[in-house]
Amino acid sequence: YSAVPIDAWVVIGILVLMMFQTWVVMYRKFRYSGRVEKGNERFRSEFAEVGTDLEQLMDNRQLEDDLRHSSLWQLYRVAVGELRTRRAQGADTNNLSAETLEAIRASMDGVRTQQNRELSSSLGVLSNAIAGGPYIGLLGTVMGIMVVFLGTAMAGDVNINAIAPGMAAALLATAMGLFVAIPALFAYNRLNGRNRDISSDMRVSLDEFVTRLAEIHATSTEPAERPASAARHDHAQTPVT
């Protein structure tokens, strides 16, 4: 290591800091996405059993604590919160208009955006490591080789045995850059795949909840129109005497 020029050591030090930063980010993001996936799986199993009482999960405090990391639970909580807020203000939540359903959907969309932003936070650190790590390492190698050649020229000794150790040591910077970038690349792709799956689950869950809400509580004018239609039909069928 004594053959490594000081310039290369500076670059290697920067790469070591980048490596620790990327590994910390990878650990935190994998841990977070794993908790979200586990919570979402639990929420799906619980929500599948609610039937027509869509609000019953909200009253289970133990379940709320268990699902605090679930992105689907966050969508569910804001939707039920919107319903209960309207009910507390005197609105008839047994008959929801299309506008009310769209307002609830908009609130859930806002939470979904926040969850997606949380999932993608800090991924820029991995992206920077992937794109910048090899180039920073290459910069250290180039600077190290330049120093080796400059020292050789000043000494007047062109013996390959004198040059080779310095060049090999300078290449350590490139190796460090690749060591930073390659794990970050695999982790970035894996985390992106997980985030896409979680985002898809949120979109499906949002649509399912709003659809079931509309099925149970949506305002329908069909029952009011049906008697008039039936009356007209009966009048048409009445024989003239």
Please identify what each model-predicted range represents.
Residues 10-16, 20, 121-151, 163, ...:
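Bilayer-spanning, highly hydrophobic alpha-helical transmembrane segments
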Residues 5, 23, 57-60, 76, ...:
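Residue-level signature of catalytic and energy-coupling elements of molecular machines
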Residues 1-4, 66, 114, 158-169:
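Membrane-helix interfacial "entry" motifs
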Residues 1-45, 191:
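Hydrophobic membrane-targeting segments
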Residues 38-135, 147-159, 186-241:
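Predominantly long cytosolic amphipathic alpha-helical stalk/bundle segments
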